[in-house]
Regions:
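Structured alpha/beta or helical-core interaction and ligand-binding surfaces enriched in interleaved
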Residues: 1-164, 169-195
Length: 195
């Protein structure tokens, strides 16, 4: 049975699926750990690789660990997260390939974010778990690599292949915070280099 409450809930859910586009200047003013080339990141910041630490071969189980990690990191950062997402540069062939493998909900999120807003740059504020889960799935499935910038507890993480995500920190205390969070979700930060 359909009622007004469901209609309202659907409307609220829909609105929360739109990322907020920000300018490159806004991004630069808010984000401390940023660089154009990943090699610069490795040279300038303490870093490590976020990887699965369990013994389960199921991709879905592994992906769930990353989704849980990123959602808890979002909470830890009080919803203060920026991502880069090059959605306006997607060619039709690439978009079709991505849409083929997404479930309906993720397809709608992607299409809505391509069509329903003015895009100021490649940077977007992300402040809810549905969107964080969506971005995580794009990364883990190697469909679209997004960099995720956490602001409250500064850390930057690059989307990457083979469920191995480079993480960058300014200071060992941030490394320990995220390392503890990773362990909680059957992940680990490996290959740590301190600067």
């Amino acid at each position: 049975m359909y009622n007004n409450h469901n209609k309202l809930s659907e409307g609220v859910l829909f609105l929360s699926q739109i990322l907020k586009s920000i300018s490159e200047d806004e991004f630069k003013n808010k984000i401390k750990i940023r660089f154009n080339n990943i090699l610069d990141g490795f040279d300038r910041y303490s870093n490590g690789l976020l990887e699965y630490n369990g013994d389960n071969d199921s991709f879905k189980i592994k992906e769930g660990c990353f989704i849980n990690f990123f959602n808890e990191a979002l909470e830890l950062n009080k919803g203060k997260v920026i991502i880069d997402l090059y959605i306006k540069k997607l060619e039709n062939e690439s978009l079709a390939r991505i849409l083929e493998v997404l479930d309906e909900r993720d397809k709608n999120i992607l299409i809505d974010n391509i069509n329903k807003q003015e895009i100021k740059s490649v940077y977007f504020e992300l402040n809810n778990k549905d969107l964080m889960s969506f971005i995580t799935r794009l990364n883990t499935r190697e469909l679209f690599f997004c960099t995720i910038y956490f602001m409250e507890k500064p850390m930057t993480i690059w989307g990457n292949y083979n469920l191995s995500f480079p993480m960058f920190f300014e200071g060992n205390n941030m490394l320990e915070i995220y390392r503890d969070l990773a362990k909680k979700h059957n992940l680990d930060v490996r290959g740590i280099v301190l600067k």
